[in-house]
């Protein structure tokens, strides 16, 4: 993961946040699919995660852990939907 990109995103660069999300979309889909199974639920989980990342990007403490942080948010959203 390119920490420079993450730092730009953390400092409010909306385009960079979008780029980071697109770079991780396959991983996000695989994780969501392993928990939810239906396309509608997967789409909802990824959409919810995207909104949260845009709102909370400034709270990421360590740029090196962006992907871990992103996937954890996604798993939490999947679990909310799965309940």
Give the ranges of each region predicted by the language model.
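A short, glycine- and basic residue-enriched loop/turn
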Residues: 14, 25, 39, 57-63, ...
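Acidic, Ser/Thr- and Pro/Gly-rich low-complexity regulatory segments
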Residues: 1-3
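Arg/Lys-rich amphipathic alpha helix in sigma70-family domain 2
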Residues: 58-61, 75-83
């Amino acid at each position: 993961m390119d920490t420079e990109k993450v730092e730009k995103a953390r400092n409010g660069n909306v385009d960079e946040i979008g780029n980071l999300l697109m770079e991780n979309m396959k991983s996000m889909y695989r994780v969501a699919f392993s928990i939810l199974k239906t396309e509608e639920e997967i789409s909802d989980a990824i959409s919810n995660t995207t909104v949260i990342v845009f709102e909370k990007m400034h709270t990421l403490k360590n740029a090196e852990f962006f992907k871990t942080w992103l996937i954890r948010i996604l798993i939490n959203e999947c679990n909310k939907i799965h309940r």
